Amino acid sequence: MAQNQNHNEDRDFLDDLIDIQDSLQVLSNPLDALMGSLSIDPNTDKPFEPMDFKEIPWSNANRCLRCASGKAEACSRCLDVCPANCIDIHNQSVRIDDEACLQCGLCVAACPTETFNTRRHTSRMLYDQVARAASAYEQCYITCTRALARKPEGNEICLPCVGMLSADIWFSILTDFDNVSVYLPLGVCDRCRTTTGEEAYTQAIATAEEWTGATVGLEVD
C-alpha cells in the first residue's frame, strides 16, 4: 500500500511540474516577460499553458440513468473511469468535487446520456476540430497536454486526455478521414495521474475500429 501511495504521489508531482513549468520560466525573467507582453500580440504568442485546454465539467442529474432508476446497478461508467474519485451520485443528484477534479474529461466521454458537459469539449466541437485539421493537412495528430508540452500546430489537436474522445466520436472520425493518428510518446501514460486514461482511449479506439474496419495510426516519437 505504501508503495502504491508513493507511486501516485510521484504521478501528482510530475503532473504539477508539467502544468507549471512555463509559468516558472516567465517568473525567472519577469523583465523579458514584461517587454514581450508590450511588443507582441498576447493572443498569438501566449506561452503554452496546459490549463487552457482543460475544464471542469458540469453535470445534469436529469440525464443520469442511475438517478432516473434509483438503482446503483443501472450505470457506473463515470464512477469507474474517474481517476480522482471526485464524482458523487446520491439522492437524485450528481456532484463533482471541483478541487479534486483533474479536468481530464473522461466522464464526459464515458457517460452514455451526456450527463456531463463542458463548454469547449462537446462531441460536435471535438469532431469539428479534428475535421478541420484533417481536411487542411496531409496528416492530423490527436494528443494530450502532457505528451505535447507545447502549443499545438495547425494539424495537432491537443486534449486534456485522449480518452475524452468517445467511441462514437472516433467512429465519425474514422468514417470520414484516413489521415488521423494518435501521438503519445512511449511511457507518457505511465507517468500520468489520469490513471484510467490509457484504458479509456484504447477501448474507445478499438470499438470504433471494429465498427468501421478502419484503423487509427499511432506515433510514439
Residues covered by each model-derived region:
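Ferredoxin-type iron-sulfur electron-transfer modules and their immediate structural context
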Residues: 1-81, 85, 137-149, 221
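Iron-sulfur cluster-binding cysteine motifs and their immediate structural context
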Residues: 71-95, 106-124
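ABC transporter nucleotide-binding domain
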Residues: 99, 121-139
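Short, charged N-terminal beta->alpha structural module
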Residues: 109, 115-116, 141-153
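Active-site regions of enzymes building and remodeling cell-envelope glycoconjugates
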Residues: 153-161
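Cofactor-cradling patches in redox/metallo enzymes
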Residues: 160, 164-165, 169-212, 216
